[in-house]
């Protein structure tokens, strides 16, 4: 749980790189946690704040394709991020 909360705190503080690292560690340690979709979305959202522009579309499409049986909320949010970042050709 510490990695989850640390990631959330970093995200709120707009420390996006640190948030992505903490949340990715959480996902690695707890791949079956019920918050996996939430943390994966936060990682993607964080990446849009710090990743080089030429990598963002790849990150977002990989995130979309990574999730098995995504919720409607997940699908809508990741699609929104893809569209917002002009990744429609991905």
What are these model-predicted stretches?
Residues 28-36, 65-77, 87-88:
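Short solvent-exposed coil/turn linkers within tandem alpha-helical repeat scaffolds
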Residues 1, 35-38:
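Start-of-helix register in tetratricopeptide repeats
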């Amino acid at each position: 749980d510490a990695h989850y909360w640390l990631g959330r705190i970093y995200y709120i503080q707009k420390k996006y790189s640190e948030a992505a690292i903490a949340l990715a560690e959480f996902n690695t340690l707890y791949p079956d946690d019920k918050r996996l979709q939430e943390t994966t979305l936060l990682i993607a959202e964080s990446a849009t704040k710090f990743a080089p522009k030429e990598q963002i579309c790849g990150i977002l499409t990989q995130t979309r394709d990574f999730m098995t049986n995504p919720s409607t909320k997940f699908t809508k949010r990741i699609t929104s991020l893809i569209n917002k970042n002009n990744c429609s050709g991905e």
